Amino acid sequence: MILEVVVYNIESALKAQAGGADRIELCDNPLEGGTTPSFGVIEGVRQNVSMDLYVMIRPRGGDFVYNNYDFYAMKRDIDQCMKLSADGVVFGILTPEARMDVKRCRELIQRARPMKVTCHRAFDVTRDAFEAHRHRFRLVCSRPRNPPASPSISPAGFSRFA
C-alpha cells in the first residue's frame, strides 16, 4: 500500500518524508479545497524531497467547471510542473451539467505526458460516478483520488468500482 500525504508547504513535505510517506500531493489554499501552489514552492519541495511529487492543478476554489482562462492557466501550470520535475499532476474538470469534461481532461492528460495524472475531487461530485469512472479508464488517468471523508463515495461504496 502506498502512503500519500497532502502537503501545503516545504516544511510539511519534509515532515511527510521523515514520517515515511511514499508520495506527496502538493497544494495551496486548504480552505478552498486545494489549488495550484506557487512555482517557487513546487521547486523548493522538489529540491528537498526524494519521494514522488504530485502537484494539484486547480486555478481556483469553488466548482470544477472552468472557463477558457482557467483552462489556459491549467495548461501552463502543467508545463511548469514538467519543467520543475514533478512526477505527476492532479486535476479534474467538469461540464456545467456535472459530468466529466472528457475533451478537456484528455487534452491535459496528453499535455502532462510523461508525468502521471490523478483524477481528483471533481470525480466525487459528478452527476454519475460510474460514468466518470468509465471515462477515467478510457482517458488512461493513472488513478482516482478519493478523500477518506468523501461524502459521495464511501469506502464500502468504492469497492463497487474495483
Regions found by a protein language model. Give the residues of each.
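Active-site mouth loops of central-metabolism enzymes
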Residues: 1-9, 57-75, 118-129
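Hydrophobic faces of well-ordered beta-strands that scaffold small-molecule active sites
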Residues: 3-5, 24-26, 45, 53-57, ...
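Active-site-adjacent beta->alpha loops and helix N-cap segments on the catalytic face
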Residues: 10-14, 18, 30-54, 68-72, ...
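Structural motif
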Residues: 19, 48, 84, 138-140
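Ordered, amphipathic secondary-structure segments that act as subunit-interaction surfaces
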Residues: 76-93, 97
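His/Asp/Glu-enriched short active-site or ligand-binding loop at hydrolase and phosphoryl-transfer sites
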Residues: 141-151
